[in-house]
Amino acid sequence: MRMYKMMGLGLAILLSLSVTGCGVKQVAMSGEGESYAVVDATGQKVKIPGKPKRILGNSASIDTMLLGVVTADHLVGATEADRDPAISYIAEDTKDIPMTIPLSGLSMELVTQARPDLVVASTYTKGEELTMYRNLGIPVVVIDGPRSIQQVKDDVRIIAAAVGEKERGENVIREMDRQLKEVDDTLGARTDKKPVVYLV
């Protein structure tokens, strides 16, 4: 039970980090430079021509992780969930992104309209959707649908590598670790206290 609570806390911390950006507001990505390769969560080696300027995440959780390492002006689409302040920590960050991705998902028309130079998807993404991106010649990086704190960290590292910001990804993970330890220490101190019973 505690593991699931800590995983939820880790995701919440990641959400808060995407808002503060860990200093990400100063990022300037050119989209130029040498190509590089990234190995995604499926073991696929993905060649990326240079730092992407037009990035498309296909879920709210992916957009949240992306905003931990890049600024919102690098995202070419935002999901309906991203924009809902009742459930999203990134509603304010994504309000000016022109394209809204409906809950029904991305169509070929929307993808061609967005013209992304990188798509970030997850292992929950349908195979035909991944095939659509690849048939359009777009590099696709797949992350795990996280089921643990470690997978959240692995996903952040893959995304950071894909956008050419590895060090920024490590900064996010270090801050996650710091906050998780702080909370774990606090919880541990509370559970270590033995109840005292007075008999009269």
Residue positions per predicted region:
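Extracytoplasmic/periplasmic mature domains of Sec-exported, cell-envelope-associated bacterial proteins
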Residues: 36-47, 52, 76, 118-121, ...
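Extracytoplasmic/periplasmic, Sec-exported soluble proteins
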Residues: 54, 58, 67, 103-106, ...
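Extracytoplasmic substrate-binding proteins
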Residues: 128-200
